[in-house]
UniProtKB/Swiss-Prot annotation:
Entry remark concerning the domains of this protein: The cysteine framework of the conopressin is C-C.
Name of a matching Pfam family: Hormone_5
Gene Ontology MF annotations: neurohypophyseal hormone activity; toxin activity
UniProt family annotation: Belongs to the vasopressin/oxytocin family.
Keywords in alphabetical order: Amidation, Disulfide bond, G-protein coupled receptor impairing toxin, Secreted, Signal, Toxin
PROSITE patterns given in the database record: NEUROHYPOPHYS_HORM
Entry GO terms, CC: extracellular space; secretory granule
Protein name, per record: Conopressin-conophysin
Lineage: Eukaryota, Metazoa, Spiralia, Lophotrochozoa, Mollusca
InterPro entries referenced in this protein's UniProt entry, alphabetically: Neurhyp_horm, Neurhyp_horm_dom_sf, Neurohypophysial_hormone_CS
Disulfide bond positions: 28-33, 50-90, 53-64, 58-80, 65-70, 97-115, 109-127, 116-121
Organism the protein comes from: Conus geographus
Length: 128
Protein backbone atom coordinates (compact mmCIF):
# COMPACT_ATOMS: atom_id res chain seq x y z
CA UNK A 1 0.00 0.00 0.00
CA UNK A 2 1.36 3.42 -0.90
CA UNK A 3 1.85 6.25 1.51
CA UNK A 4 -0.83 8.46 -0.10
CA UNK A 5 -3.36 5.60 0.04
CA UNK A 6 -2.70 5.19 3.78
CA UNK A 7 -3.16 8.93 4.35
CA UNK A 8 -6.39 8.83 2.35
CA UNK A 9 -7.62 5.89 4.45
CA UNK A 10 -6.83 7.73 7.68
CA UNK A 11 -8.58 10.85 6.44
CA UNK A 12 -11.66 8.81 5.52
CA UNK A 13 -11.63 7.13 8.94
CA UNK A 14 -11.36 10.49 10.74
CA UNK A 15 -14.19 11.96 8.65
CA UNK A 16 -16.40 8.93 9.37
CA UNK A 17 -15.71 9.20 13.11
CA UNK A 18 -16.51 12.93 13.07
CA UNK A 19 -19.75 12.26 11.21
CA UNK A 20 -20.68 9.52 13.68
CA UNK A 21 -19.91 11.84 16.60
CA UNK A 22 -22.00 14.61 15.05
CA UNK A 23 -24.97 12.30 14.51
CA UNK A 24 -24.90 10.80 18.02
CA UNK A 25 -24.60 14.01 20.03
CA UNK A 26 -27.66 15.89 21.21
CA UNK A 27 -26.23 19.31 20.60
CA UNK A 28 -28.46 22.21 19.81
CA UNK A 29 -27.39 24.31 16.91
CA UNK A 30 -28.11 27.98 16.28
CA UNK A 31 -31.50 27.37 14.68
CA UNK A 32 -32.99 24.90 17.17
CA UNK A 33 -31.76 25.98 20.62
CA UNK A 34 -34.27 27.02 23.28
CA UNK A 35 -33.87 30.58 24.60
CA UNK A 36 -31.74 29.65 27.61
CA UNK A 37 -29.78 26.83 25.96
CA UNK A 38 -30.48 23.14 25.66
CA UNK A 39 -30.39 22.54 29.42
CA UNK A 40 -32.52 25.55 30.35
CA UNK A 41 -36.09 24.20 30.55
CA UNK A 42 -37.48 20.71 30.23
CA UNK A 43 -40.20 20.93 27.57
CA UNK A 44 -42.53 18.71 29.59
CA UNK A 45 -42.76 21.39 32.28
CA UNK A 46 -43.36 24.59 30.33
CA UNK A 47 -46.01 25.80 32.80
CA UNK A 48 -46.37 25.66 36.55
CA UNK A 49 -49.11 26.68 38.97
CA UNK A 50 -49.25 30.41 39.74
CA UNK A 51 -48.25 31.67 43.18
CA UNK A 52 -50.95 31.81 45.81
CA UNK A 53 -51.76 35.10 47.51
CA UNK A 54 -53.97 36.14 50.44
CA UNK A 55 -57.20 34.53 49.25
CA UNK A 56 -56.51 33.11 45.81
CA UNK A 57 -53.89 33.07 43.09
CA UNK A 58 -51.67 35.60 41.35
CA UNK A 59 -53.01 36.31 37.88
CA UNK A 60 -50.60 39.11 36.97
CA UNK A 61 -48.18 41.56 38.56
CA UNK A 62 -50.00 43.22 41.46
CA UNK A 63 -53.23 41.24 40.81
CA UNK A 64 -54.53 38.65 43.30
CA UNK A 65 -57.88 36.93 42.61
CA UNK A 66 -59.98 34.38 44.41
CA UNK A 67 -63.60 33.36 45.01
CA UNK A 68 -64.56 36.67 46.65
CA UNK A 69 -63.05 38.91 43.93
CA UNK A 70 -59.74 40.52 43.03
CA UNK A 71 -57.28 42.81 44.78
CA UNK A 72 -55.08 45.09 42.71
CA UNK A 73 -52.16 47.07 44.06
CA UNK A 74 -52.62 46.05 47.71
CA UNK A 75 -49.66 44.91 49.80
CA UNK A 76 -50.71 41.27 49.41
CA UNK A 77 -51.29 41.62 45.66
CA UNK A 78 -47.88 43.27 45.25
CA UNK A 79 -46.32 39.93 46.25
CA UNK A 80 -47.40 38.72 42.81
CA UNK A 81 -44.56 40.73 41.26
CA UNK A 82 -42.28 37.84 42.29
CA UNK A 83 -44.08 35.65 39.76
CA UNK A 84 -42.67 37.76 36.89
CA UNK A 85 -39.11 37.03 38.04
CA UNK A 86 -39.50 33.30 37.37
CA UNK A 87 -38.52 32.33 33.78
CA UNK A 88 -41.13 29.53 33.70
CA UNK A 89 -44.59 30.99 33.03
CA UNK A 90 -47.44 30.01 35.32
CA UNK A 91 -50.83 28.63 34.36
CA UNK A 92 -53.79 30.49 35.87
CA UNK A 93 -56.48 28.12 37.12
CA UNK A 94 -59.93 28.87 35.75
CA UNK A 95 -62.26 28.49 32.79
CA UNK A 96 -61.06 30.20 29.59
CA UNK A 97 -62.67 33.48 28.55
CA UNK A 98 -62.08 35.82 25.61
CA UNK A 99 -61.54 39.56 25.96
CA UNK A 100 -61.67 42.32 23.41
CA UNK A 101 -58.11 43.33 24.27
CA UNK A 102 -55.72 43.71 21.27
CA UNK A 103 -52.80 41.31 21.39
CA UNK A 104 -53.88 39.57 24.57
CA UNK A 105 -57.43 38.25 24.23
CA UNK A 106 -57.26 34.82 25.88
CA UNK A 107 -57.87 35.04 29.60
CA UNK A 108 -59.17 32.97 32.49
CA UNK A 109 -62.19 33.31 34.76
CA UNK A 110 -60.57 33.97 38.12
CA UNK A 111 -63.59 35.02 40.18
CA UNK A 112 -67.35 35.21 39.78
CA UNK A 113 -67.89 37.44 36.72
CA UNK A 114 -64.22 38.45 36.34
CA UNK A 115 -61.92 37.53 33.43
CA UNK A 116 -58.20 38.32 33.62
CA UNK A 117 -55.24 38.28 31.26
CA UNK A 118 -51.61 38.97 32.16
CA UNK A 119 -52.00 42.64 32.93
CA UNK A 120 -55.70 43.47 33.27
CA UNK A 121 -59.05 42.18 34.49
CA UNK A 122 -62.59 42.99 33.38
CA UNK A 123 -66.18 42.05 34.11
CA UNK A 124 -67.20 39.17 31.84
CA UNK A 125 -70.63 37.55 31.61
CA UNK A 126 -69.09 34.23 30.56
CA UNK A 127 -67.49 33.89 34.00
CA UNK A 128 -70.73 33.78 35.99
Amino acid sequence: MTRSAMQMGRLTLVLCLLLLLLLTTQACFIRNCPKGGKRDVDERYLFKACMSCSFGQCVGPRICCGPRGCEMGTAEANRCIEEDEDPIPCQVVGQHCDLNNPGNIHGNCVANGICCVDDTCTIHTGCL
